[in-house]
């Protein structure tokens, strides 16, 4: 089983435990924090399991998931850039939030199926608890990728009275995402330089890859 798993990933490793979890992305081995976090939890709870970063090329993603479905020792894990959207079609099921925003960041094995979830939505909402955002406060969201979709969905659902600005490098992508929304108090910026023209932003949310490990743009 170890050999076959390594045939689908770029960073080869040896499984130290029978049960294992993965963080799946293009290069999570380059500084992903999830393995360090979860492996400390497993150790403290005396759970014989370990999480590994799995660097996967897009052409091997489908076969990797196919393999993991058959391997009962795989308990689940995380999904990171750039596969939060692409991985959905290979899973057995996804939860309601994932369907809504078309993005998965967590996989769990349940009843011999791999089910996708999105914890970005609720996690982001929880992170805003410490901020006292008033109705008159303006919000700027940068990015419309996997995490960005979750952020945008939460902002649109919970801050309907606030003025909202959105920017994404791919203008067509964010317009497609927002086309069904009520455009009242909603503004989409075409160019990054347009941000400097806004004077009333109270909260800026970075949902881009800038600042993610060694990712710089």
Where do the language-model regions lie?
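Short glycine-rich anion-binding loops that position phosphate/pyrophosphate groups of nucleotides
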Residues: 79-86, 146-147, 209-212
């Amino acid at each position: 089983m170890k050999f076959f798993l390594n045939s689908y990933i770029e960073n080869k490793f040896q499984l130290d435990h029978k049960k294992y979890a993965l963080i799946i992305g293009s290069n999570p081995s380059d500084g992903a924090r999830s393995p360090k976090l979860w492996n400390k939890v497993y150790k403290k709870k005396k759970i014989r399991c370990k999480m590994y970063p799995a660097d996967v090329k897009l052409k091997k993603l489908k076969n990797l998931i196919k393999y993991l479905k058959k391997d009962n020792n795989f308990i689940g894990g995380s999904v990171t850039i750039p596969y939060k959207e692409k991985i959905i079609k290979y899973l057995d099921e996804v939860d309601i939030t994932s369907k809504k925003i078309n993005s998965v960041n967590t996989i769990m094995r349940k009843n011999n199926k791999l089910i996708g979830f999105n914890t970005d939505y609720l996690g982001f909402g929880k992170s805003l608890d410490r901020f006292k955002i008033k109705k008159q406060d303006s919000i700027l969201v940068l990015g419309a990728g996997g995490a960005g979709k979750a952020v945008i969905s939460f902002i649109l659902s919970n801050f309907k009275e606030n003025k909202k600005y959105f920017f994404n490098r791919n203008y067509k992508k964010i317009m497609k995402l927002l086309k069904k929304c009520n455009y009242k108090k909603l503004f989409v910026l075409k160019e990054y330089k347009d941000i400097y023209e806004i004077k009333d932003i109270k909260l800026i949310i970075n949902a881009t890859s800038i600042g993610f490990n060694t990712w710089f743009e």
